[in-house]
Design a protein with these regions (language model features):
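Catalytic cores of Mg2+-dependent Asp-rich isoprenoid enzymes
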Residues: 1-178, 189-270
Length: 270
């Protein structure tokens, strides 16, 4: 079981400039002014640190033991305390608190994200599709909402004002579309890392089991049930894609060109 000092040392050792797995948010944010880009990078660093610690542990240990669950849970609660700059002394803690305050980052987004990480620690996969969708609000919609919030901020005399639209409603369809695409695209990679994002009830409906999914990821022939399940997930993703197009038409006229472009880039990357 890792100690808090070990977790902190690992966190500080991560070179966030070299993250290459899923850089879409920061690729798109490069079109912003530097201050907003740095704000996105700070929030992304916070979220990516939590996500990577948990996923890497699962990949290395084929799950999370009860002792490690307690340690991870403690760390997630501790990191949520970073938002109080008065209680934290490290430069990064202060940077995160400053960013949240300066850019009016909605606290619910960070809280929902942390809750999804707690779900990852406590649970092994998803019993139902509804469980996965609820989890996705924290794991995908929350980070996307921060991105949309930063892109939609209105600046007046050096002060940032909230976007002129509902950030969560705007972010949700594109975030869900991209997340479904992500789990379909990365099925084999996730399985090989002991990660499973496909719901048990959907697998059962198509005559699949977790064991069968793992076997196919390791090279066994794909079954008709597997292909049917993937089509079902693609249909769900396509519904979110259609909703995204509607939302984009609504909000794009309210945004400056460079920030509108960044949203379009995120969508097109998927």
């Amino acid at each position: 079981m890792k100690t808090r000092d070990q977790f902190t040392a690992l966190f500080e050792s991560i070179d966030f400039e070299k993250i290459i797995d899923h850089p879409n948010i920061l690729i798109a944010a490069n079109f912003w002014d530097n201050e907003r880009y740095c704000a996105a990078r700070t929030c992304y660093r916070f979220m990516r640190a939590l996500d990577d610690l948990i996923d890497n542990h699962k990949a290395a240990h084929q799950g999370i033991s009860m002792d490690d669950r307690e340690s991870f849970t403690s760390e997630i609660r501790h990191w949520m305390g970073m938002l109080d700059r008065q209680m934290n002394k490290s430069p990064f803690n202060n940077e995160l608190g400053y960013t949240v305050e300066r850019f009016r980052i909605p606290l619910w987004s960070l809280e929902y994200f942390a809750e999804s990480m707690l779900y990852d620690v406590i649970h092994d996969g998803f019993a139902t599709l509804d469980d996965f969708i609820e989890y996705s609000i924290g794991a995908s919609v929350a980070p996307a909402s921060i991105f949309v919030h930063l892109a939609g901020l209105q600046e007046h005399d050096g002060v940032y004002l909230d976007p002129p639209f509902d950030v969560r409603r705007t972010a949700e369809p594109c975030a869900m579309f991209s997340y479904f695409v992500h789990i379909i695209r990365d099925f084999r990679k996730d399985q090989l890392n002991n990660l499973s994002y496909f719901a048990d009830d959907v697998m059962t409906r198509h005559g699949l089991t977790r064991t069968a999914m793992s076997e196919m990821a390791h090279g066994a022939p794909l079954t008709p049930g597997f292909r049917a399940m993937m089509r079902e997930y693609l249909d769900i993703a396509d519904c979110y894609r259609a909703d995204t197009l509607i939302i984009m038409d609504e909000i794009c006229p309210k945004m400056e060109p460079r920030y509108r472009l960044s949203l379009e880039i995120i969508f097109e990357l998927y």
